[in-house]
Design a protein with these regions (language model features):
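Catalytic-site signature of metal-activated, phosphate-bearing donor transferases
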Residues: 18-24, 42-168
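Acidic donor-binding segment of Leloir-type glycosyltransferases
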Residues: 1-13
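Conserved Rossmann-like nucleotide-binding pocket used by diverse enzymes
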Residues: 7, 35, 62
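Flexible helix-coil transition and linker loops at the boundaries of alpha-helical arrays
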Residues: 139-144, 174-188
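TPR/TPR-like alpha-solenoid signature
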Residues: 151, 188-189
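Short beta-strand-to-loop acidic/aromatic patch adjacent to the donor-nucleotide binding site
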Residues: 25-44
């Protein structure tokens, strides 16, 4: 009645990149723009008109404000740019957890950045994230040069009390030539 088609897919073994790619494959190929959000994320009002204003015909991906953490008055504590608005056919999701978009297009990748769009994150603090450790280990097994997930794996070992593994992994993170983001480097030290 409202033009919505609901599809169901069970993903075993669970991986976030596989789930997102299956979801992406359900989107018609002639779709211009994909907007990927999670159930615990909410765009501020006016996001769609801002997207239509900012997006250009040759744009492949858009970075926008992401409030990962908010205080009790809904003011940002941790804010950064996130890039989960993208052209339909130019990307695939990679990494079993802390998944990211990887460009697979055949033309030049054109990324834009805007402050006109904001996505707020309202995490369910009761939700278990126990699968993250094994998924991060798998991610590093698949790509031992991925500095981002190497950092996250070291951090996850620390959260679980595996301090020697955490130290070894965070030292590996710091030794990667691609590990240049100052915030993650500082946290790994």
């Amino acid at each position: 009645e409202l033009g919505v088609i609901v599809k169901k897919k069970i993903i075993k073994p669970w991986r976030f990149d596989v789930a997102r790619n299956i979801s992406l494959n359900m989107v018609d190929k002639d779709t211009d723009i994909c907007v990927c959000t999670d159930l615990d994320e909410v765009f501020l009002k006016g996001w769609r008109s801002s997207l239509e204003e900012v997006w250009q015909e040759n744009t492949t991906r858009l970075a926008y404000n992401y409030n990962w953490s908010l205080d009790k008055n809904n003011k940002p504590i941790i804010n950064f740019y996130i890039e989960k608005i993208h052209s339909r056919n130019d990307y695939t999701w990679t990494h079993p957890v802390h998944e990211v978009l990887s460009y697979i297009g055949d033309k030049e990748e054109i990324k834009l950045t805007t402050d006109l769009i904001t996505l707020n994150h309202y995490p369910d603090k009761t939700k278990s994230r126990s699968s993250y450790l094994s998924l991060l280990e798998l991610s590093i097994k698949e790509d031992p040069t991925d500095d981002r997930n190497m950092h996250y794996l070291g951090r996850e070992y620390m959260y679980h009390g595996y301090f020697n593994k955490a130290i070894d992994t965070l030292i590996k993170h710091l030794s990667l030539k691609s590990a240049t983001w100052h915030d993650e480097r500082a946290a790994s030290m």
